[in-house]
């Protein structure tokens, strides 16, 4: 997890940083293990049979609900608290609905990135990646939701994203740089994962 939040609004079990969950797991390592197994299976399931193809903010939230719904009551719902991580402050909670709708409206205006050259697709994907990362609409599970959404969007546009081509730490570092306005590392990462 690793988010910085107000302890009174944490949604965690008292005296811990473990999120309240449907399995009542109070050990972070146990929750991480269950979460990893469930979310991996759910991501594969979504990839094989997407439950939504509107590519709007409701679609994004539907992916989160699908991935995390067996774990958290709030899956698919935008967070109601402000969060930051590793020095990055994410979109204020009260702005999430408006900003989220605007981000995904742009995807629609750009025709879901269909018919773009690889170079142009990479530029649009970079912008959307940065915007959805800055949005960070959920209490937990933002990166995994983002990757499932972007992979589906890419497939719809005639491309494929292979996140296994990059190390998780490399992606995280590139994302941190992008949040500081330094796009090149994330551009390089996306160049590796976009397949035709």
Predicted regions and their residues:
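FIC/Doc superfamily catalytic core
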Residues: 1-196
